């Protein structure tokens, strides 16, 4: 006999926290999953110059392809968070990873289906964005339910370091594959590894019964009980929630601009430099920076510092100080200095994992996936505009300084908003959850 839908949903929601061995196993697995997510995501930026030469794209057209990822990415954030809150984030992550891994692996085939290269690549990037958009909201939902509050920042920073691992792996291995076998091999590499990871999670960490129950709850499309509805009116009446949204928007947009355009910046500004240096070093620095930020954040809280004080300190590093080094990138002609500034900016941005990303879980742990989805939707929309605007500014002015000025403006807007209005008290508690 199958359990009642409400009971199945409670089972899948994961009301119990992970034991220490379970937490260690899932943390390592999710670290690898985040790594592969960014392997797939950063494959296109690594290949942009070579693909532009093959297909005759200019910077505006390359900007369209790069930014089209965010057109899809912004549409599934809230859905991913809601599904994670409802059926369990691990199921959402597994199902989406199987799809984006397949799309990545067949991208070279799509590029050669017809002469409409730009249209097919834009379509594949939109689809990739749709599939990857559910990942971080579902991850936030999963960790808010399964990880102790005192360990949340460090766990999130470990898993979040996968973004740097993935970009580092693509930068290091991808640069060699690009030189030896051509740009197509990078997509085969990242897509194939993702599908292997999906098989591992399905084989060793999730049972077939778990996925069947999850799909069954979705297929029944039963209305969520009033007790489990998202108190969205209550949430968005709070200035702290809006501060979190604006800060996450700024952090995501700044990161997406640098992720999309830094490879092109180095290849055009320093054409004789070795690609593996500028594609590897910034992300190599970012990994220990991410882990250190999580350790420092949890240590300060355990020492008695207020949570909001620690979160604001992390954001000051992640948005404020990182933007200073981004500005420096536009005012140097030295390759070594550029690598140092890029490494410092990217490394300091990882402090956002222990700032705003965890602050969202502070504010609303019962619906953290939904709220993170809303905030990351705003960030993805800003990413679309930011990446396209960056390409337009460089095409019209011929200067990279405009791009880095844009990053600094966006970062400091988010920082100022969070410093003034940010809080860490729960805002999702109410005897009656309001709904439309």
UniProtKB/Swiss-Prot annotation:
Q: Which GO terms describe its molecular function?
A: ADP transmembrane transporter activity; ATP transmembrane transporter activity; guanine nucleotide transmembrane transporter activity; purine nucleotide uniporter activity
Does the keyword Secreted feature in the UniProt annotation?
no
**SUPFAM superfamilies per the UniProt record, alphabetical:** MFS general substrate transporter
Extract one GO BP annotation from the record.
ADP transport
Q: What is its main location?
A: membrane
Activity control, as annotated, is: Activity is chloride-dependent. Inhibited by AMP-PNP, gammaS-ATP, diadenosine triphosphate, 4,4'- diisothiocyanatostilbene-2,2'-disulfonate (DIDS) and Evans blue.
The catalytic activity, as recorded, is:
ATP(in) = ATP(out); ADP(in) = ADP(out); GTP(in) = GTP(out)
List cellular component terms (GO): chromaffin granule membrane; lysosomal membrane; mucin granule; transport vesicle membrane
Q: Tell me the keywords, alphabetical order.
A: Cytoplasmic vesicle, Disease variant, Lysosome, Membrane, Transmembrane, Transmembrane helix, Transport
Q: Which CDD domains match?
A: MFS_SLC17A9_like (cd17380)
Q: What tissues is it present in?
A: Widely expressed, but more predominantly in adrenal gland, brain and thyroid.
What InterPro entries does this protein map onto? Answer: MFS (IPR011701), MFS_dom (IPR020846), MFS_Na/Anion_cotransporter (IPR050382), MFS_trans_sf (IPR036259), SLC17A9-like (IPR044777), Sugar_transporter_CS (IPR005829)
Name any one Pfam family assigned in the record: MFS_1
Where, by residue number, does the polypeptide cross the bilayer?
64-84, 92-112, 118-138, 158-178, 181-201, 239-259, 276-296, 316-336, 369-389, 402-422
UniProt membrane topology term: Multi-pass membrane protein
Q: Where in or outside the cell is it found?
A: Cytoplasmic vesicle, Secretory vesicle, Chromaffin granule membrane; Cytoplasmic vesicle, Secretory vesicle membrane; Lysosome membrane
Q: Gene3D superfamilies attached here?
A: MFS general substrate transporter like domains
Q: Tell me what disease the record lists for it.
A: Porokeratosis 8, disseminated superficial actinic type: A form of porokeratosis, a disorder of faulty keratinization characterized by one or more atrophic patches surrounded by a distinctive hyperkeratotic ridgelike border called the cornoid lamella. The keratotic lesions can progress to overt cutaneous neoplasms, typically squamous cell carcinomas. Multiple clinical variants of porokeratosis are recognized, including porokeratosis of Mibelli, linear porokeratosis, disseminated superficial actinic porokeratosis, palmoplantar porokeratosis, and punctate porokeratosis.
Q: Family assignment?
A: Belongs to the major facilitator superfamily. Sodium/anion cotransporter family.
Reported function? Voltage-gated ATP nucleotide uniporter that can also transport the purine nucleotides ADP and GTP. Uses the membrane potential as the driving force to control ATP accumulation in lysosomes and secretory vesicles. By controlling ATP storage in lysosomes, regulates ATP-dependent proteins of these organelles. Also indirectly regulates the exocytosis of ATP through its import into lysosomes in astrocytes and secretory vesicles such as adrenal chromaffin granules, mucin granules and synaptic vesicles.
PANTHER family attached here?
A: SOLUTE CARRIER FAMILY 17 (PTHR11662), VOLTAGE-GATED PURINE NUCLEOTIDE UNIPORTER SLC17A9 (PTHR11662:SF279)
- Protein's UniProt name: Voltage-gated purine nucleotide uniporter SLC17A9
Species of provenance: Homo sapiens (Human)
